[in-house]
Amino acid sequence: MSSVSPEDRENTVWTVDEHLEDILAAVHPLDPIELQLPDAQGCVLVEDVTVPVALPPFDNSSMDGYAVRVADVAGASEEFPAVLTVIGDVAAGSDGLPEVGPGQAARIMTGAPLPPGAEAVVPVEWTDGGTGGGAATAMLPAGAAPEGAGGEVRVHRPAEARAHVRARGSDVPAGALALAAGTVLGPPQIGLLAAIGRGTVKVRPRPRVVVLSTGSELVQPGAELGPGQIYDSNSFALAAAARDAGAIAYRVGAVTDDADTLRATIEDQLVRADLLVTTGGVSVGAYDVVKEALSGASDADQPGGGVEFRRLAMQPGKPQGFGSVGPEHIPLLALPGNPVSSYVSFELFVRPAIRALMGLPDLHRPRARAALSADAPLSSPAGKRQFLRGTYDAQAGTVTPVGGAGSHLVAALARADALIVVPEDTTRVEPGDALEVVLIG
């Protein structure tokens, strides 16, 4: 953390960049582990993966049809079809392949290896399917084919060499780079690893993020509200945001405004946490329980630990906390309790921390420059970086504010796909002025 003496911290106002810098300096990528492919989805590859064998590993058919020699069908037409002797079936997974000689053909299925002697595949639709009639529309089942898999087939069109043949290594040649270190493993990447024969892979695991909200007024959605109560929305929103960032999220039910209860809850969650996120209780009120419970975290018992609470030059999200707890010094980020404040704080500070734990180079949301689309000028407090909610039109290059600047406006946040950034030295923004926007949608 930044080297400010304890007596000065109470009056210090930190910038957004200073706070983020301290967080990222204390958060390090998780240690790599070897995982089975089904468990590796969403994880980050820590080593280059090369292809041990070509993909596909052999020449194979891309169509259901007949494997033929090019010369045998060179003059084929509807009026004068090439009549070939069918010597057998070649299905996917076949071994002991028949050799196709002059005047011969082999029935072949999609994905089946091209038999020796064959130079091309003619789709079944270019033939009579061995029925002696007109053009076929589908391959007959092996048991229903005339004379089993034998007999004759009439081919109505010529084929060029290698027609409808997928060449060995046409997808990825042996020795080529399949996936680079730093790749996030999604379904296509998992499929590629399986296709080249990898059963396990070395990755950084998805961070385990525990989210808990505080406040005796909070009620689980679905329950009946009592006097002075509100539904707990923050823990649901932040857990969803953590999953969206790539983490495994655990949402803990709202904790009452009791410091001992909060400390005990946090201690219980350490066993399954790579990062702890709290929301609420970080301001200057009489019931700001997070600040009460964690401000006095004992560095004597856990050297290097403790949570520091700060005032940031930003709106919304002025009160923030950051530090570590427990014997393993699990990072903890304490966010404000107002819904918009907590979500904006997550995007600015928690999401980059999660991405850093994953070892990813791209920690932040994409950003763009956009012209303000508004009916009137906007005001912003001097000396604070303001984050307004907005909708971004990439084609027009504009951003339109949604709702006001209030930190409780959940409905406006739900309609937004961007955060409009008003710099600290700007107090008035005119329609048409260019501003930076953080793309969150």
Please name every model-derived segment:
Residues 33, 37-38, 46-47, 60, ...:
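Flexible glycine/proline-rich
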Residues 11-18, 32-35, 39, 53, ...:
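Conserved active-site and cofactor/substrate-binding residues in soluble primary-metabolism enzymes
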Residues 24-31, 48, 114, 128, ...:
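Structural signal for hydrophobic packing residues in well-ordered secondary-structure cores
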Residues 1-3, 8-16, 201-335, 339-345, ...:
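Helix-rich terminal scaffold detector
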Residues 1-78, 84, 107, 138, ...:
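Short, low-complexity N-terminal leaders and the immediately following helix N-cap/first helix
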Residues 2-10, 14, 67-256, 399, ...:
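Short, glycine/charged-enriched hinge/interface segments at domain edges or termini
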Residues 61, 101, 122, 271, ...:
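Structured loop/turn residues at beta-strand edges in well-structured enzyme cores
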